[in-house]
Amino acid sequence: MRLPIFLDTDPGIDDAVAIAAAIFAPELDLQLMTTVAGNVSVEKTTRNALQLLHFWNAEIPLAQGAAVPLVRAPRDAASVHGESGMAGYDFVEHNRKPLGIPAFLAIRDALMRAPEPVTLVAIGPLTNIALLLSQCPECKPYIRRLVIMGGSAGRGNCTPNAEFNIAADPEAAACVFRSGIEIVMCGLDVTNQAILTPDYLATLPELNRTGKMLHALFSHYRSGSMQSGLRMHDLCAIAWLVRPDLFTLKPCFVAVETQGEFTSGTTVVDIDGCLGKPANVQVALDLNVKGFQQWVAEVLALVP
């Protein structure tokens, strides 16, 4: 039976690969997409998500979400993804529109209609998820688990300690990590290992039309290079859903620093139990890289 999922995203070039896998992996049933400001503005992430859905002729409802973090000024990752968020490929025009309600309400309504609890997947800042949990706490029993791409037990990628998705809205992340829902965190400890090799990247234009599109996007992606390999950060959250055997997880207490002058946005991962607090997150600490690369190749071969 296919696993029902809702995907919250901020496309973003590596988001595009994650969205492809979420749509076409035969084990998954992507029922709703929502967008959030992150890699670029929410208007751009929404436009990019709609372009991808149209490209793949995927009839999946999409709702636009939060334009700004809960309490602080927005930051973006245009330096990594380009000013549009998905530079490098000319998508055809379409007339698709997002739903007429905010993302967190769209998630609430879809959860309440679902016949069974649903897995939420968040591969951008956690603003929409925090709004859902704080404004609609009655939804918690309908969430099977939350799988995120975000955080790190070690170094950061936008500050020495903080990963971008958490640092973009630390207050939202803190709310989510305190919520009591089941959380799986695929952070930089694994996503920095999730590299597509130059040899594989060179095969994409001959794979299919999606391969050609992704190859064009990848030429503008700055998380690695076409010559050294590219990190597929967001794809790790989708990979865990389908191939959890590729990941080494450890239950840990995780908190988010919101006040530090140099550490705001840091996920404090208590690997050794020093704080004596109960674990609230399953933290991915290692990845079977060859297995991941093989799975990616298998999934992208299924995409038209």
UniProtKB/Swiss-Prot annotation:
The active site is at H233. This is Non-specific ribonucleoside hydrolase RihC. PROSITE patterns: IUNH. It comes from Escherichia coli O17:K52:H18 (strain UMN026 / ExPEC). It is an enzyme of class 3 (hydrolase). Keywords: Glycosidase, Hydrolase. One of its GO terms (biological process) is purine nucleobase metabolic process. The keyword Transport does not apply. Belongs to the IUNH family. RihC subfamily. Hydrolyzes both purine and pyrimidine ribonucleosides with a broad-substrate specificity. Its EC number is 3.2.-.-. GO terms for cellular component: cytosol. GO terms for molecular function: purine nucleosidase activity; uridine nucleosidase activity. It comes from the Bacteria. Pfam families: IU_nuc_hydro.
